């Protein structure tokens, strides 16, 4: 993801909503950019923490360990986190962090040392009321716990709210493991209430955490999952797939393609199936100008980040396909991270039903706010989502007298 795409996006939104140059310039520039060079086992690694906007509260965003992490990417992701927290209507801003490293090349001890070094480099600019990191690509609850432990050592007191995505035993929140999928399911349920459907068939591209849990949750609610896929390919059964069996096959063999009660298909084929709901939950840019005209779903639920290109969006809208955009559809994850932060700060612990009830309330409210705007104008659902999120951030900036 390039930061130039953010600039282009803001120019487009600015023209639609008549935001002035000062307002747009404020959003184009992250408030703070922090960089460091870390060294583990004689090798040096670039580390970043970007705080895009704190007008609505402390910034929130994950830390990723990946060989392609760059400052440009982290800046772009921090911006999207500002939009996502505003969309979910939680009182937090957007941030992001990362280390340019291939964690598969490091031992567990080296990963722990690198994680603690990251906190030592940035502990003065993070904190429960300043910047709250979380897991992201190739970072885990265990890594978050190491980071939290290091932060507490450095400041000399307990501060579990400094980081979310921790293990349950260390102050993590129940439901966090399914939060992204569950939040998306709540949004989809609201959309289905407003669209006349003769059947409820679903295809899920991606069978990692979000895709697998979405398939399970939707099947439990009576929707028919007819196709799923992972990086090795997909499986189709128009009579409906047994999701529990698929989970077992994936766990035991490494791929859903080894499931025997169905027809093997490609990831590209899955996207073009004649289903009611399409759930891209794996990669960016899978729905493009090349295949958008072949999409037959009535609803696209974006559990992945950025699965639809802007050119494809126009085609889908012209076909009256409702796209539930990523910053809404997968905001369940950051919302339950917010709940974890609240529980830590209050020295409290919510049971699973409490978390689910609060998550549903947040996701339904966010959807309803956007749907109201969507029903009043000629812009697609994604554009309305972005407009509302940017307006919330700028309204907060105005109240602070910064714009």
Describe the predicted segments one by one.
Residues 2-37:
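Short, Gly/Pro- and small/polar-rich lid/capping loops
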Residues 5-8, 69-72, 106-117, 138-142, ...:
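Conserved active-site and cofactor/substrate-binding residues in soluble primary-metabolism enzymes
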Residues 30-103:
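Glycine-rich, N-terminal phosphate-binding loop and its surrounding beta-alpha-beta segment
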Residues 85-198:
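Glycine/serine-rich phosphate-binding loop and adjoining beta1-alpha1 elements at the start
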Residues 164-167, 172-274:
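Glycine-rich phosphate/diphosphate-binding loop of Rossmann-like nucleotide-binding domains
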Residues 191, 293, 297-403:
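Adenosine-phosphate binding glycine-rich loop
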Residues 233-323:
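Rossmann-like adenosine-cofactor binding region
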